[in-house]
């Protein structure tokens, strides 16, 4: 079971796959925190120590025991007024203005499944995936109950926490502060990792040692904000991407928040995350309950990357609810940077037509389609289609776009209102303002009071009229200002719940709608939004170089599948920087991928690059969005930005690298990969080179010399599974073979993959410490390939197909005597053997004395490795293939002239006939499906 209660010691233990969380009700009734970290089956109450601490008070119930003080003990949910002078999780004020809550244990319940939060986003799971622990603390004097909720997702290595606060008295109480979670550590030297920023430069990583005192950050802007993300990591000193202990907290909330990390007088650490107490004062009438939004906790003993991966899996599988979260999503083009406000219906159709020719799937009509909206001064709140501007109805425009084979999306900003709007003129009181005071403007707009149901209903009805006009596939929900004019202490919280209510209704009414969140880019990039929208526009900054840093910081908690990322025009509209089309594409592929430009202004070469980029992205989309994500560099300090995605089976990987700094006579840059199988052999698809997983992870790959500023590379790796399976069979055969030296032939049709398989098999032998030599039989025809092709044609012309059949692969074509001599010399144990090397042109034939001392395996890679004329092969291995497959591979290989000619095709067919006859000689067969079986 994930949750265990020990009634003798009153200890609650929460287990995940690799972690343990433990707390205890002490003899006085206080709930003390014992432990959170690597999995253990021990009772951790021994960590509690007691001493007489000067100026640290003692609860009255402790009697004369001066060693008991809540000011020095680790607590699960500390409150104000108990003699604990550190930062507290809860502050309750009664009608008389007294701020105190002395919370003691009352009861608990363990149940299957994950608790739910009314009106709030939260991690979801079925009954088999999670368990819930609910602990009730109470203060009868303050007349308040605090329900601590714990959700344990065992296999995901996450624990969620939330709090319900109930007024059990007859009078009103006021919540002045409420954290969702507190973590107390009795020891440890920690760094605090937080993610700061600004509009168009969000989520920059800052790592700060936690000294004595408090590091605090948060938002009081009404949103989670561009300035600080509602997430924090507490890492032990020296923790890296791949080693060390670290703890994460992620707030599932989109409004004001506060995070406090404190090191106290006794070198203990407290970490708090929850609602921001500034501008917050929430009244609770008798019997009412208040819910604090959820925090997701996770711990890693294997560094920051593992911690990030745990959050990525949790968000993809247990936060995002959209049907699109695990689906391939459309590659879109957005009209904003293509046209801004200056567009018509014809403009959108032309954009769709051009985009369709490039392989783009969807066009999105951004701001400017409603009311009198030709700039940012008017019409927010008036969600009626401007048919004059569009040259017809929205339904007609949608049809015209769909006729181009394109999906259609639209932009909305439901929370906003302009003073120059019909809605404002009808309901000026619906805009948030302080009575008797002029409101604060931002971007020439005001904020609608979404805490009021009638306001939400009015806007929702307008939006539904728009969405019901045709098949709208996608909506981008924007929010382009911060909240000011907070007229009441409950406003900011109730406002966010109003936004969630609106989004819930929207998602329920339009379940097939792909919703993308946005707030001036990444101003509301949080887990709360991802509950409703599977992706969020990562930043209004589309500069490829800045984006490497923005997406790097975002990746510490949020998966690639959540990051809206597009290729934009150059010079970049935000920075003026010029980067290559390829570099912009590589960076945008670390996200949902799309375009933010006018394709009509592109060159033919750039348009072709778009086609190639989309082809590449769709090939690797599942790997990018569902794979295990690894950060390979720090773009704030390193000369490159590098990252990779690895498939769950570790058989595919995509590595991306962007050069950030240029210098003359630059040293070679090596990139070490992560997350691969050490003993597996991987093929790099572009170069055809093979590497062991261990080599890629420990030595890395050298990057080609950089030839231009901000150059980018992508490397795709595929595990050669057939080689691994074959090696297992070959190894068993070798173990049962008494010979000191063995010869293994890999044979099959031309272009069937013999070289790739043989090279990988050689790598497996070398990995295990077995010296192995790879010999190519292509060095042993009587004539160089060019002359041999001529001879084949001569034979065919003189003797027809029967004559050609009697020539191919026989002693007439192949110097079997010479290669048989090589195999015999190897079996005889000779340390030096003369080998022949043959090129493809006249004069490219040479003899070379080769050292075979210490070599115990000779791999012969050759079409004719199963011939009856070949002697000395101990284990022939046959590769299945058809003539059609062989022909296609030869064409792709592009080594032979006229590979697709009728004559060559017939040669391949005759070759295949002979191979089917020679198949009987094989000891092992590699099937077309990659299986390996005995003859």
UniProtKB/Swiss-Prot annotation:
Transferase as a keyword?
yes
Map out region (Sucrose kinase) in residue numbers.
721-935
Q: Which residues participate in ATP binding?
A: 748-752, 824
The catalytic activity of this protein is classed by the Enzyme Commission as 3.2.1.22, 2.7.-.-
How does activity change as temperature rises? Optimum temperature is 50 degrees Celsius.
Active site residues per record: 526, 606
| Positions bound to Mg(2+) | 176, 277, 280
List required co-factors.
Mg(2+)
How does pH shape activity? Optimum pH is 6.0. Active between pH 4.0-6.5.
A GO term, aspect molecular function: nucleotidyltransferase activity
Catalyses: Hydrolysis of terminal, non-reducing alpha-D-galactose residues in alpha-D-galactosides, including galactose oligosaccharides, galactomannans and galactolipids
Q: Which residues bind substrate?
A: 366-367, 443, 476-480, 518-521, 540
Task: Report keywords, A-Z.
Answer: ATP-binding, Glycosidase, Hydrolase, Kinase, Magnesium, Metal-binding, Multifunctional enzyme, Nucleotide-binding, Nucleotidyltransferase, Transferase
A biological process (GO) of this protein is: melibiose catabolic process
Stretches for region Alpha-galactosidase: 1-720
* UniProt subunit comment: Homotetramer.
Membership in a protein family: In the N-terminal section; belongs to the glycosyl hydrolase 36 family.
Described by its record, this protein's role is as follows: Bifunctional enzyme with alpha-galactosidase and sucrose kinase activities. Produces sucrose-6-phosphate directly from raffinose. Binds ATP. Phosphorylates sucrose specifically on the C6 position of glucose in the presence of ATP. Hydrolyzes melibiose, raffinose, stachyose and synthetic substrate p-nitrophenyl-alpha-D-galactopyranoside with high activity. Low activity against locust bean gum, guar gum and synthetic substrates xylose alpha-D-4-nitrophenol, glucose alpha-D-4-nitrophenol and o-nitrophenyl-alpha-D-galactopyranoside.
What is the name listed in the Swiss-Prot or TrEMBL entry for this protein? Bifunctional alpha-galactosidase/sucrose kinase AgaSK
Its gene is agaSK
């Amino acid at each position: 079971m994930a949750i265990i209660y020990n009634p003798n010691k009153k200890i609650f233990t929460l287990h995940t796959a690799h972690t343990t969380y433990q707390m205890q009700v002490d003899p006085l009734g206080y709930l003390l925190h014992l432990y959170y970290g690597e999995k253990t089956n021990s009772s951790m109450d021994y960590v509690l120590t007691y001493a007489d601490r000067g100026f640290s008070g003692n609860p009255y119930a402790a009697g004369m025991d001066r060693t008991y003080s809540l000011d020095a003990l680790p607590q699960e949910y500390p409150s104000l007024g108990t003699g604990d002078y550190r930062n507290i999780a809860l502050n309750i004020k009664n009608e008389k203005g007294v701020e105190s809550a002395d919370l003691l244990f009352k009861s608990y319940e363990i149940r299957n499944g994950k608790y739910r939060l009314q009106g709030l986003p939260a991690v979801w799971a079925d009954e088999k995936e999670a368990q819930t622990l609910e602990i009730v603390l109470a203060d009868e004097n303050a007349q308040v109950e605090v329900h601590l909720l714990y959700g344990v997702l065992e296999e995901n290595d996450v624990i969620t926490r939330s709090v319900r606060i109930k007024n059990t008295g007859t009078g009103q109480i006021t919540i002045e502060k409420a954290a969702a979670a507190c973590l107390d550590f009795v020891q440890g030297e920690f760094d605090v990792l937080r993610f700061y920023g600004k509009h168009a430069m969000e989520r920059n990583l800052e790592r700060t040692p936690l000294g004595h005192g408090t590091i605090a950050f948060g938002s009081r802007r009404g949103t989670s904000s561009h300035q600080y993300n509602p997430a924090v990591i507490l890492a032990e000193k020296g923790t890296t991407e791949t080693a060390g202990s670290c703890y994460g907290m992620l707030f599932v909330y989109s409004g004001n928040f506060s995070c406090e990390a404190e090191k106290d007088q006794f070198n203990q650490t407290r970490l708090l995350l929850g609602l921001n107490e500034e501008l917050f004062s929430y009244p609770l009438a008798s019997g009412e309950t208040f819910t604090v939004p959820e925090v997701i906790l996770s711990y890693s003993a294997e560094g920051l990357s593992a911690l990030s991966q745990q959050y990525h899996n949790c968000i993809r599988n247990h936060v995002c609810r959209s049907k699109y979260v695990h689906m391939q999503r459309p590659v879109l083009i957005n009209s904003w940077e293509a046209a801004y406000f200056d567009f018509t219906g014809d403009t959108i159709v032309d954009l769709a037509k051009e985009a369709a020719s490039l392989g783009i799937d969807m066009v999105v009509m951004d701001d400017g389609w409603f009311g009198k909206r030709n700039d940012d001064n008017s019409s927010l709140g008036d969600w009626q289609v401007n048919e004059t501007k569009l040259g017809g109805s929205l339904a007609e425009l949608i049809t015209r776009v769909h006729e181009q084979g394109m999906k259609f999306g639209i932009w909305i900003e439901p929370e906003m209102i302009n003073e120059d709007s019909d809605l404002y003129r009808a309901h000026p009181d619906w805009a948030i303002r302080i009575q008797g005071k002029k409101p604060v403007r931002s971007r020439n707009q005001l904020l609608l009071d979404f805490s009021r149901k009638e306001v939400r209903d009015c806007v929702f009805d307008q939006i539904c009229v728009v969405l019901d006009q045709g098949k709208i596939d996608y909506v981008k929900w924007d929010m382009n200002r911060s909240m000011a004019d907070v007229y009441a202490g409950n406003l900011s919280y109730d406002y966010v719940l109003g936004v969630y209510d609106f989004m819930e209704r929207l998602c329920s009414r339009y379940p097939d709608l792909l919703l993308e969140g946005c707030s001036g880019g990444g101003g509301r990039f949080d887990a709360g939004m991802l509950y409703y929208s599977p992706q969020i526009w990562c930043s209004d900054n589309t500069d490829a170089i800045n984006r490497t840093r923005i997406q790097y910081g975002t990746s510490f908690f949020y998966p690639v599948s959540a990051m809206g990322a597009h290729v934009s025009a150059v010079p970049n509209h935000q920075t003026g920087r010029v980067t290559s089309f390829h570099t912009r594409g590589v960076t945008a592929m670390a996200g949902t991928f799309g375009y933010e430009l006018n394709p009509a202004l592109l060159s033919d070469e750039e348009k072709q690059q778009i086609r190639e980029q989309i082809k590449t992205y769709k090939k690797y989309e599942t790997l990018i969005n569902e794979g295990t994500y690894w950060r390979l560099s720090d773009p704030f300090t390193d000369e490159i930005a590098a990252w990779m995605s690895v498939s769950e089976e570790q058989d595919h990987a995509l590595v991306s690298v962007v050069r950030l700094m240029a210098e003359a006579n630059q040293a070679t840059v090596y990139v070490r990969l992560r997350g691969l199988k050490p003993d597996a052999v991987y093929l790099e698809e572009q170069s055809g080179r093979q590497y062991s997983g261990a080599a890629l992870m420990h030595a890395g790959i050298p990057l080609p010399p950089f030839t231009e500023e901000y150059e980018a590379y992508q490397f795709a790796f595929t595990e050669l599974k057939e080689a691994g399976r074959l090696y297992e069979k070959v190894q068993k055969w070798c173990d049962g073979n008494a010979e000191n030296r063995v010869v293994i032939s890999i044979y099959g049709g031309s272009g069937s993959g013999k070289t790739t398989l043989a090279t990988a098999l050689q790598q497996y032998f070398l990995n295990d410490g077995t010296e192995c030599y790879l010999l190519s039989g292509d060095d042993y025809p009587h004539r160089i390939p060019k002359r041999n092709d001529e001879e084949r044609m001569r034979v065919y012309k003189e003797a027809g197909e029967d004559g050609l059949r009697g020539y191919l692969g026989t002693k007439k074509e192949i110097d079997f005597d010479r290669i048989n001599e090589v195999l015999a010399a190897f079996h005889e144990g000779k340390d030096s053997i003369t080998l022949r090397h043959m090129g493809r042109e006249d004069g490219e034939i040479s003899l070379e004395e080769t050292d075979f001392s210490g070599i115990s395996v000779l791999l012969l890679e050759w079409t004719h490795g199963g011939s009856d004329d070949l002697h000395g092969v101990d284990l022939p291995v046959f590769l299945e293939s058809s003539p059609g497959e062989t022909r296609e591979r030869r064409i792709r290989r592009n080594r032979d002239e006229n590979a697709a000619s009728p004559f060559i095709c017939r040669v391949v067919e005759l070759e295949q006939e002979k191979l089917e006859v020679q198949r009987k000689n094989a000891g092992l067969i590699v099937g077309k499906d990659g299986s390996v079986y005995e003859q």
